[in-house]
Amino acid sequence: MEKTYVAIDLKSFYASVECVERQLDPLNTNLVVADESRTEKTICLAVSPSLKSFGISGRARLFEVIQRVEQVNKERLQKAPKRQFAKKSYIYSELSDPACELDYIVATPQMAKYLAVSAKIYGIYLKYVSPEDIFAYSIDEVFIDATGYLGLYNVDGRGFAQMLILDVLKTTGITATAGVGTNMYLCKVAMDIVAKHIPADKNGVRIAELNEQLYKETLWGHTPITDFWRVGAGTASRLEKLGIYTMGDISRWSLDHYLIGKLYKVFGKNTELLIDHAWGIEPTAIPDVKSYRPSNNSISSGQVLQEPCNYERTRLILWEMADMLSLDLVDKGIVTNQIVLTVGYDKESLADGHYTGEVVCDHYGRKIPKHAHGTQNLGRHTSSTRKIIDTTMALFDRIIDKTLLARRLNLTACNVIREEDIPEVESYEQISLFDMAEAANADNNAEEKERALQEAMLLIKHKYGKNAILKGTNYTEGATARVRNRSIGGH
């Protein structure tokens, strides 16, 4: 029996939520979601569809939005009566008047609000399908195995998708794009690529469909290849070096044993995924995704600093991150035996011309010093705040260039396991003839007291909020924990 999968993506979700909250039409309002208090370099979390139509990227920085709007208004001014604007408006339809100046709303991010609306929409989906047949891919995107529901509702895949989307629109005012396919890959590609090139209906809804044959006929020659799910810039660059630019190219290579060997040399096991996707094949189903557990678990804490930070302030912020990471481990009942740290430097580090080390290009093509990266083993699995902070600080001091300005921090606890799964060999401590039993006992007592303190802090934080109990360091000038504790996802 042929399967039917549906992928649904809420259109410019954050921006749509902000428009609906203001009783504005999300498809007819120029709005950007960004935190103006973080300077004009802040990344926009969402841009409304109408504002995107002026050539603004969905992930632009605020200053890029400002510059583009200024440019658009300069062009509009040339066509305005007497070269003067009579009014300005953030309503897209009003811009049909040549005397109207383009305006837009800057909405401060409300992550808690977006999560609540996302949960409400998920509840709408559950009116139609069982939880076992739906997978939440992100806050605004889901996969649904619709196979068993088409007969129940007497619809095809397109009709099923439309039924759900219209209910969401009626209930929340938010519209969506959907893809329908015979597997999870094809429905995702139908949504990401095909739906973008078809006209929207009267509700702004776009629904595209793909099966394996249609995929080959319409998308084997599609460029850029990065439009396809799971093909990033790095993969595309390596493919280009082999002379591969399209999914059709990959499928042709897969028919030649020699060329397959070349692919395996570059991509290893991922070659199988590339070839499957080139042919429109995806054997993974929703139950497989839900039951997957990575073999090597880790837990990370990352932070993009609001401004370039010197050594002292970066060290302070990292201390807070290590402190919070250890509490997170205790809260989850897990332990780690390895810390990995990455420090990304800011482009301003090159301003004085004194840096002589390796230079790389960041995501935006700007030259920056190569990041610092290091690993430090803890000796045994632990969630001790003292141990994790001390190890993190020592690792930081070992890898950092104190003359450079930091902009990104990523701290990872690796080889994470449950406390009850700690190997027996780690539970015993070998004491030599020269060790003092009292010292060993004192260390154990210190860890027991520390654990009691950690659990007490977590109890207070869960009951009264993350900022209900803090350490003196968190009140030091330049610390960020108090602000981050009041935000979700950094906003």
Tell where the protein language model's regions lie, with residue ranges:
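DNA-contacting surface of Y-family translesion DNA polymerases
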Residues: 7, 227, 237-406, 426
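C-terminal hydrophobic structural anchor segments
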Residues: 394, 398-453, 458-459
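Generic "edge-of-domain/loop-turn" microfeature
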Residues: 38, 151, 185, 304, ...
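A glycine-rich phosphate-binding loop feature that marks nucleotide/adenosyl-phosphate handling sites
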Residues: 182-185, 276-278, 335-347, 405-418, ...
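Short aromatic/hydrophobic contact patches that present stacked aromatics
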Residues: 143, 377, 410
